[in-house]
């Protein structure tokens, strides 16, 4: 009996066959459209399933990775050994007055749309971010002068010892692309956001403005993980990369976007190695020319 058969048996009481996919191509589950297979991909749709899955993995010493929308992840070409828990089906959104509670697999654009529907302001910045709620809280995602820390009230998380706890905004320790969740290896279950009442036409106008700006300035026509690098203090990664003469620079099937140099794109059937090699090349050139270290914002996972 091979390891994958063991996985199927192990999770068969918890999942329907349609929720288990063996040797799933990760290139079909991340926005970069690269990456080798995972032994088994599970798609839970309840909190109980998520908790029990993680407990089974820990009890059996099976490596696991929790994936939201796959928008800020790069999976290596050799794939992932163990289990990927994809939360795309765990995506309920419930509004109560000025608060919205969303499960971690819910898309930010859907939360933004729910806020707009109720004339709630504060989440316009997230209307075009392609990520999920869990991933956004994990890294304190932001865009256009807004970020998760401005609107979050609390998050329900699973701690490393398997307990479900609720963390207040302060306890989340949200900073630039970081959080207590990231530092302590917690898993986001739900997040609750608190908004101000606003004027629907103004909110709609801002959403439309940001959508147009994103379409004009970002290479949305190519697979990517958004901004590849974190913003270095006192600089902008995209400008450093452009000033280093790397606009449109290509390595294999990966390229620096000519539209926005902060984006690496999968231009022509790139491999994960193409993208990783390009990341490394950019880091070396920017360091050599400007003495500035660039650190990836995209999460890199998988086997070498």
Curated annotation (Swiss-Prot):
Residues 33-198 form the FAD-binding PCMH-type domain. Pathway: Cell wall biogenesis; peptidoglycan biosynthesis. It catalyses: UDP-N-acetyl-alpha-D-muramate + NADP(+) = UDP-N-acetyl-3-O-(1-carboxyvinyl)-alpha-D-glucosamine + NADPH + H(+). The keyword Cell division applies. Its EC number is 1.3.1.98. One of its GO terms (biological process) is regulation of cell shape. Pfam families: FAD_binding_4 (PF01565), MurB_C (PF02873). Its cofactor is FAD. It comes from the Bacteria. InterPro entries: FAD-bd_PCMH (IPR016166), FAD-bd_PCMH-like_sf (IPR036318), FAD-bd_PCMH_sub1 (IPR016167), FAD-bd_PCMH_sub2 (IPR016169), MurB (IPR003170), MurB_C (IPR011601), MurB_C_sf (IPR036635), Oxid_FAD_bind_N (IPR006094). The keyword Protease does not apply. GO terms for cellular component: cytosol. PROSITE patterns: FAD_PCMH. Keywords: Cell cycle, Cell division, Cell shape, Cell wall biogenesis/degradation, Cytoplasm, FAD, Flavoprotein, NADP, Oxidoreductase, Peptidoglycan synthesis. GO terms for molecular function: FAD binding; UDP-N-acetylmuramate dehydrogenase activity. Coiled coil: none annotated. Gene3D superfamilies: 3.30.465.10, UDP-N-acetylenolpyruvoylglucosamine reductase, C-terminal domain, Uridine Diphospho-n-acetylenolpyruvylglucosamine Reductase, domain 2. Cell wall formation. PANTHER family: UDP-N-ACETYLENOLPYRUVOYLGLUCOSAMINE REDUCTASE. This is UDP-N-acetylenolpyruvoylglucosamine reductase. It comes from Clostridium botulinum (strain Eklund 17B / Type B).
């Amino acid at each position: 009996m091979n390891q994958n058969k063991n996985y199927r048996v192990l999770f068969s009481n918890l999942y329907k066959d349609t929720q288990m996919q063996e040797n799933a191509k990760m290139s079909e589950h991340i926005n970069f459209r690269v990456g080798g297979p995972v032994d088994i991909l599970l798609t839970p749709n309840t909190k109980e399933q998520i908790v029990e899955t993680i407990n089974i993995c820990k009890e059996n010493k099976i490596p696991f990775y929790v994936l939201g929308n796959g928008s800020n992840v790069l999976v290596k070409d050799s794939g992932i050994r163990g289990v990927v828990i994809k939360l795309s089906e765990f995506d309920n959104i419930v509004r109560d007055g000025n608060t919205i509670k969303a499960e971690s697999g819910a898309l930010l654009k859907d939360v933004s749309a729910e806020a707009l529907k109720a004339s709630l302001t504060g989440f316009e910045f997230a209307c075009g971010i392609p990520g999920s709620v869990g991933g956004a809280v994990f890294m304190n995602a932001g865009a256009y002068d807004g970020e998760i820390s401005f609107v979050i009230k609390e998050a329900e998380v699973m701690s490393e010892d398997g307990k479900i706890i609720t963390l207040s905004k302060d306890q989340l320790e949200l900073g630039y692309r970081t959080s207590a969740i990231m530092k302590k290896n917690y898993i986001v279950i739900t997040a609750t956001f608190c908004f101000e009442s606003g004027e629907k036409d103004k909110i709609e106008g801002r959403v439309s403005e940001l959508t147009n700006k994103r379409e004009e300035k970002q290479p949305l026509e190519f697979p990517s993980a958004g901004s590849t690098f974190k913003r270095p203090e006192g600089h902008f990664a995209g400008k450093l990369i452009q000033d280093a003469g790397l606009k449109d620079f290509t390595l294999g099937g990966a390229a620096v976007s000519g539209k926005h140099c902060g984006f690496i794109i999968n231009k022509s059937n790139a491999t994960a190695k193409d993208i990783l090699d390009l990341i490394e090349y950019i880091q070396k050139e920017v360091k050599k020319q400007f003495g500035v270290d660039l650190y990836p914002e995209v999460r890199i996972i998988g086997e070498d």
